[in-house]
């Protein structure tokens, strides 16, 4: 026999995010409303965006801070139908020449440029396919574009910024947002 008593709790995270857990019947939820599940959903729906933003920004910051590579490894060109494939292929060749490694690269491309690749796919000698499932470091990504042998993951532009601000989380404001004078990152390899 299961007996339930109810006490209301408010779960708050370190990002100024609060969840209100309403009274539920275990028969309806199957005991699924637990702190673990609420935290997992927060991580899946909100925290992953912040982690992506921070990681991409940190990689950009490291490349931009390297005087030997910041002019060759960071591309500021806007991707269009006419230059998208050549820009990504050129950056891949630069990185391969520099690292002397031929495999293991992944391109992160702003989702707003996906149309440029779709439009350019027909008129090129490159092998471009969309909708692939690719395993990268043990994580399977769906809807990946393959440009020859390079997996290209389309990422929301909001996660690809040159400047970020980590908010305090003291009030309702929390998380990571684009910083003042932030520019868009079109692609990262």
Predicted regions located by residue number:
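Sequence/fold signature of self-assembling virion shell proteins
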Residues: 10-12, 79, 119-189
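Alpha-helical scaffold segments that mediate packing/assembly in large oligomeric complexes
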Residues: 20-97
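Short, flexible loop/turn elements at secondary-structure junctions
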Residues: 15, 23, 111-113
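Extended, solvent-exposed, turn-rich assembly/linker loops in the middle of proteins
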Residues: 64-138
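Short helix/loop capping segments that flank catalytic or ligand/cofactor-binding pockets
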Residues: 20, 29-30, 116-119, 163
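Assembly/oligomerization interface modules of large self-assembling protein complexes
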Residues: 1-15
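Hydrophobic beta-strand residues in large extracellular and virion-surface proteins
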Residues: 19, 88, 107-108, 152-154
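Residues at beta-strand starts and edge strands
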Residues: 13-17, 37, 103
């Amino acid at each position: 026999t299961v007996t339930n008593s109810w006490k209301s709790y408010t779960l708050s995270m370190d990002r100024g995010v609060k969840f209100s857990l309403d009274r539920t019947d275990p028969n309806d939820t199957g005991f699924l409303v637990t702190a673990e599940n609420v935290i997992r959903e927060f991580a899946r729906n909100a925290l992953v965006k912040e982690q992506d933003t921070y990681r991409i920004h940190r990689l950009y910051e490291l490349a931009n801070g390297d005087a030997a590579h910041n002019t060759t490894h960071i591309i500021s060109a806007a991707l269009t139908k006419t230059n998208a494939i050549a820009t990504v292929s050129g950056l891949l060749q630069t990185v391969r020449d520099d690292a002397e490694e031929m495999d293991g690269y992944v391109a992160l491309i702003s989702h707003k440029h996906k149309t440029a690749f779709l439009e350019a796919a027909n008129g090129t000698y490159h092998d471009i396919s969309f909708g692939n499932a690719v395993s990268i470091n043990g994580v399977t990504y769906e809807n990946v574009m393959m440009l020859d042998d390079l997996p290209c993951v389309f990422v929301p532009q909001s996660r690809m910024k040159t400047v970020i601000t980590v908010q305090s989380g003291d009030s309702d404001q929390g998380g990571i947002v684009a910083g003042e004078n932030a520019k868009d990152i079109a692609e990262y390899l």
